[in-house]
Amino acid sequence: MITKREDIRNIAIIAHVDHGKTTLVDELLKQSGTFRENQEVAERVMDSNDIERERGITILSKNTAITYKDTKINIIDTTGHADFGGEVERVLKMVNGVVLVVDAFEGVMPQTKFVLQKALELNLSVIVCINKIDRPEARPNEVIDEILELFIDLDANEDQLDCPFIFASAKSGYAIADLNDERKDMQPLFDCIVNNIPAPEGDPDADTQMLISTIDYNEFVGRIGVGKIENGKLKVNQEVTIVNHHDPSVRKRVRITKLYTFSGLNKVDVPEASFGDIVAVSGIADIHIGDTLCSVENPVAIPFQKISEPTLSMDFMVNDSPLAGKEGKFVTSRHIRDRLFRELNTDVSLRVEENPGSENSFKVSGRGELHLSVLIENMRREGYEFAVSKAEVLYHTDERGKKLEPIELAYVDVPEEFSGSVIQKLSQRKGELLGMTPINGGYTRLQFSIPSRGLIGYRGEFMTDTKGNGIINTSFEGYEEYKGDISYRKTGSLIAYEDGEAVTYGLFNAQDRGTLFIGPGEKVYAGMIIGENPRTEDIEVNVCKTKHLTNTRSSSADEALRLVPPKILSLEQALDYIDTDELLEVTPTHLRIRKKILDSTLRYRANKK
């Protein structure tokens, strides 16, 4: 018989990047008594991954649970970046409602639309939390109108349109149901969750069913599958059948060795859990996202949410430069292959395939440049050494044979004086200006529809054009007819002439030709790119050249050579910079840009063809 678990609420916190989801979860954890009063807690405690803490973004969805009065609230903190949208899509299957967090100043942004659309498609209950209302430039009433317009644009039904609004400052630790209410604590949000999010439903006596929505890993117990029990119960030592989501005919009987529920930031061992509980199971070696744990007697799979397809790809390959193998721990094609295919176990948005005709190269497809750059950064930190190519978009073909390309919706916030330059640059990259709105602080918000390939390599140029004051946010919109050719980099490269070590004298002579990426003492090799030429052509320079010494000295002492500090490129900047005939060499200690063909004579012949 179908019953409700009134003692449980399962919710996801969804939002655009940097609208304050993780800070909000921090405050809910603190005010629910999850931490001791004297316990020191890091800011954004849910962002446990090093890259997440450095960049201030959530990449992987996290599970936590709090108890408010007599109700256990399971909370999933999701990512707000479009490149990790696959994380959002699958974890929403575990919950009955969402808290949509929207910045009281920025309002509705591209990812707000994406995450809300996914929640409405699954018919989830929505609570709108307008966060950061303590900002001086906050405009909560206007943001309410923007959100209601978005609901209407997404064809929300009457029940969904009638969702409650909460106003909050997660940083200051309060939430209010009305802007005139006293600002004390988060209790209004707790009450709103308990009163408006439906309790999970299921049949406690039915056959066991649990969809695996995320995979965790622990070196002591191995792979850990996380999901919500839809029906029945799970017990330690229970024998269950795993039904593979790719092929439901593939089934395997396994035994549950450990069963956990969530409490605060910890997993808690439990002997048994019932429908509605979000749990973690271990002891199953080859469990994958999308698989269903079922009773042995009646194995019925739960349909898995289709994940949006990748839009960009890069080639990952063995590093074959003259400096190959000197800095990395894992350098062979087998190492790289195993690591890439292992990533597929936890990242459902990623695709990996071996490039035909080359056993040392792999085509890796993802949802955007950030998606792939985070994978590259993780591999670097783990000791891998490899090379990657420039990102390319993935084209589709319609039924008439027309070429289709991925299109992004871009929201660009820039100081008014730079808006003309940004409009010109994005228009050259086949962007179509959809709207232009003045916002507070002398900024203008530009809304563009632009091909994904038009944004490849643009962010560095954008930061230069806006003197670091611009913000660009994008979200995948769909596929449209090919918009025509785009000319990318307008500059050439300064290329090292020979193998050796860069010296001050050689760099001093080279710096007049353009902007250098390296300083003295760095190892270089022929074909390595050591700087940028402001003109379109590539120039070979000898940065290893030392000054010719004579046994006579000039009457005045040699003037000290002054070098301009080099421009050190970050991983994202380097990926933005490389052209189609170039590669980025990635090692745990260095990023080097190089030509695909290192030999200048062979390169010249290839360019003439």
Enumerate the predicted regions with their spans.
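P-loop NTPase switch module centered on the Walker A-proximal segment
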Residues: 1-102, 106, 146, 215-218
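Interdomain boundary/hinge elements
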Residues: 41-44, 154-166, 200-211, 240, ...
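Canonical P-loop GTPase G-domain recognition
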Residues: 125, 135-195
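Short glycine/threonine-rich beta-strand-turn micro-motifs
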Residues: 169, 356-371
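Conserved nucleotide-binding/hydrolysis modules and their immediate coupling elements
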Residues: 209-314, 324-326, 337, 491, ...
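Helix N-cap motif at beta-to-alpha junctions
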Residues: 233, 285-286, 366-372, 415-419, ...
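Long insertion/accessory domains within large nucleic-acid-processing enzymes
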Residues: 262, 267-270, 404, 450, ...
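A short, contiguous, amphipathic alpha-helix enriched in charged residues
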Residues: 321-344, 560, 564
